Amino acid sequence: MRACAILVVAAAAVLTGSTAISSTDALELATLSKTAQDVELSSVAAQPRSNIQRRLRKHKTVNTNSEMEYESEAEARGLVPEKLTNLVNKFKKVGGEVMLKTKSLNQLKKLSEKMEEKSLYALTDLEKKGYTPETLRDAIKNTPPKGMKDADADELIKFYDEYWKIFH
């Protein structure tokens, strides 16, 4: 009997506490929504009646160059991150100038074709001199050309092997 009475009292306390909390939340929500409406109404009332809508400014905001210089300095603008600026500068210095000077992908394609033609002439010239892939490999190992790195020599041998397989 005592346990039942304790459970009933505990349940009543929980229910009254939860209803009190929910009513407090509802009261706060009503107060907040009323103040938000008041703020909206006061901001609308502060504007002239004829021009309630806000409009974006026109693209051209100044008449002369001097006004434009002043306007551009005074106006807040989005700043480019320093990392991005450094990256663009490095790109321009390293190899971007070559890409920026080209006008189209067709020009790059023509350049690539010219390079392929030159390399094809060089490979056919090696064949005319009597080199096979094995003899070329031995010749490079025995007397490497001046200024040629090992990676370049390996690449030349690889290209000549492919050329030999295609044309023989």
Swiss-Prot record:
Subcellular location: Secreted; Host nucleus; Host cytoplasm
Family: Belongs to the RxLR effector family.
Name of the protein: RxLR effector protein PITG_12737
Major location category of this protein: secreted
Keyword Isomerase: no
Domains as described in the record: The RxLR-dEER motif acts to carry the protein into the host cell cytoplasm through binding to cell surface phosphatidylinositol-3-phosphate.
One Gene Ontology cellular component: extracellular region
Signal peptide annotation: 1-20
Organism: Phytophthora infestans (strain T30-4) (Potato late blight agent)
Induction description: Expression is induced during host plant infection.
Keyword flag Signal: yes
Motif stretch (RxLR-dEER): 54-77
Function: Effector that enhances P.infestans colonization of Nicotiana benthamiana leaves.
Keywords: Host cytoplasm, Host nucleus, Secreted, Signal, Virulence
Coiled coil (residue ranges): none
